[in-house]
């Protein structure tokens, strides 16, 4: 039986560092919000069977998303952290029968709206049948410095270091178990949760264009990338 590929977009964050008057996933770039750009990527991809967005219970912007993408499931059961939001989304997928334990969940940042289709294809093709799952990532290119009191304390050897991106693909059952802990402190992405179970996810070559909208100046680069598509 073919595994389903389900995109899960945690969008309950408020994006404090971005400094806008609304959560950054709802900032408009061009004629669409960041989140709408993200959803378009998954809705256009032939290998993605279902897309789910998990937002905060207090979210007042999600209705516009639902109107623009009526086929997307928008659930208002987000948590206080990304890990809690993903946990709640995966749990509901399993409880409702929309996902089986062996189906693939592709967790993607709501602020990464320039994900190239070919990178998504590569992740699904190379990690979609792997029990350990996998994530998009790129080798660290810049020299890394360790800081202490505003000064360099050491230069970090970057050999073997990769910068994690999203989507991060794992079977629903594995991801559910990985996020079942009551205390999710220190879980910054799905791979880190899975690693705590002793699983070693695959690293799949990502793409430099798949940047995360974090600081206000990132919006300029994102506009250029979206206009180039």
Curated annotation (Swiss-Prot):
Reactions the enzyme catalyzes: 2-C-methyl-D-erythritol 4-phosphate + CTP + H(+) = 4-CDP-2-C-methyl-D-erythritol + diphosphate
Pathway(s) of this molecule: Isoprenoid biosynthesis; isopentenyl diphosphate biosynthesis via DXP pathway; isopentenyl diphosphate from 1-deoxy-D-xylulose 5-phosphate: step 2/6
A Pfam cross-reference name: IspD
Family annotation (InterPro entries): IspD (IPR001228), IspD/TarI (IPR034683), IspD/TarI_cytidylyltransf_bact (IPR050088), ISPD_synthase_CS (IPR018294), Nucleotide-diphossugar_trans (IPR029044)
GO biological process annotation, one example: isopentenyl diphosphate biosynthetic process, methylerythritol 4-phosphate pathway
Claim: Methyltransferase is one of the keywords in the record: no
EC annotation from Swiss-Prot or TrEMBL: 2.7.7.60
Domain of life of the native organism: Bacteria
Keywords: Isoprene biosynthesis, Nucleotidyltransferase, Transferase
GO molecular function term, any single one: 2-C-methyl-D-erythritol 4-phosphate cytidylyltransferase activity
UniProt site (Positions MEP for the nucleophilic attack): 158, 212
Site annotation Transition state stabilizer: residues: 17, 24
Family: Belongs to the IspD/TarI cytidylyltransferase family. IspD subfamily.
Function: Catalyzes the formation of 4-diphosphocytidyl-2-C-methyl-D-erythritol from CTP and 2-C-methyl-D-erythritol 4-phosphate (MEP).
Name of the molecule in the record: 2-C-methyl-D-erythritol 4-phosphate cytidylyltransferase
Gene (name only): ispD
């Amino acid at each position: 039986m073919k595994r389903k590929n389900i995109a899960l977009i945690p969008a309950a964050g408020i994006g404090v560092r971005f400094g806008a008057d609304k959560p950054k996933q709802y900032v408009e770039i061009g004629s669409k919000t960041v989140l709408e750009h993200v959803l378009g990527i998954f809705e256009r991809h032939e290998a993605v069977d279902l897309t789910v967005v998990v937002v905060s219970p207090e979210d007042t912007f999600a209705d516009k998303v639902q109107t623009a993408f009526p086929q997307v499931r928008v659930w208002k059961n987000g948590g206080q952290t990304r890990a809690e939001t993903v946990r709640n989304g995966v749990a509901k997928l399993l409880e409702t029968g929309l996902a089986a334990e062996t189906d693939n969940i592709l967790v993607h940042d709501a602020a990464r709206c320039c994900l190239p289709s070919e990178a998504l294809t590569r992740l699904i093709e190379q990690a979609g049948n792997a029990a350990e799952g996998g994530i998009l990532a790129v080798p660290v290119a810049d020299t890394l410095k360790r800081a202490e009191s505003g000064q360099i304390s050491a230069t970090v050897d970057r050999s073997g270091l990769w910068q994690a991106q999203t989507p991060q693909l794992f079977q629903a059952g594995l991801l559910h178990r990985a996020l079942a802990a009551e205390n999710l402190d220190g879980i910054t992405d799905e791979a880190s949760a899975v690693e705590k179970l002793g699983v070693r996810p695959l690293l799949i070559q990502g793409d430099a264009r798949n940047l995360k909208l974090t600081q206000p100046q990132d919006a300029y680069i994102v506009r250029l990338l979206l206009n180039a598509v």
